[in-house]
Amino acid sequence: MKLVPVALLYLGSLAFLGADTARLDVASEFRKKWNKWAVSRGKRELRVSSSYPTGLAEVKAGPAQTLIRTQDVKGASRNPQTSGPDAARIRVKRYRQSMNNFQGPRSFGCRFGTCTVQKLAHQIYQFTDNDKDGVAPRSKISPQGYGRRRRRSLPEPGLRRTLLFPEPRPGGAPAPRAHQVLANLLKM
């Protein structure tokens, strides 16, 4: 019975310690992934100017070997005017590049099918609704017209209450000018 745990221990240690015999090239795989990431990042950003260091690591290490070559980057600028320090700080968003290539009419708003159905239904309703008028008739705009019931329920003009004086003034004394302006604003 003691032989089984010892054999398992021996096989486990052999598998664990003997793993270095199978040569796994992890470093080259990591290097490939890192290079791929760096190239894709280089495509997105403009080249950083080499005239001044941008980070603390570059100051201490001095000039370092770059992972990205200019011929690797497809969209690299070959124009010497754009490689100045001002151009290094500009980043271009991806969607703007694709939007500039689109020359069709640009319509803003909802483009879903449900929105199209709603817009169509609204247009049909507007074209077929001949009963309603877009403008209120003159009789409704006059002071005796629209909202006349509400106006009847208000107190008389001389007995108006203001925010500062909630009680009506005795004898219908005129309110100061500031109170009259405030009352006119509240009427609207």
Swiss-Prot record:
Keyword annotations of the record: Amidation, Cleavage on pair of basic residues, Disulfide bond, Hormone, Secreted, Signal
Disulfide bond residue pairs: C110-C115
Modified residues (Tyrosine amide): Y146
Pfam families noted in UniProt: Calc_CGRP_IAPP
Gene Ontology MF term list: adrenomedullin receptor binding; hormone activity
Organism domain of life: Eukaryota
N-terminal signal peptide: 1-21
Site (Required for CALCRL receptor interaction) location in chain: T116, Y125
Chain segments carrying region Disordered: 131-176
Modification type Arginine amide: residues: R41
CC per GO annotation: extracellular space
Localisation per UniProt entry: Secreted
Cleaved propeptide residues: 45-92, 153-188
Its job: Numerous actions have been reported most related to the physiologic control of fluid and electrolyte homeostasis.
Protein name in UniProt: Pro-adrenomedullin
Biological source species: Canis lupus familiaris
Lineage of origin: Eukaryota, Metazoa, Chordata, Craniata, Vertebrata
Name of encoding gene: ADM
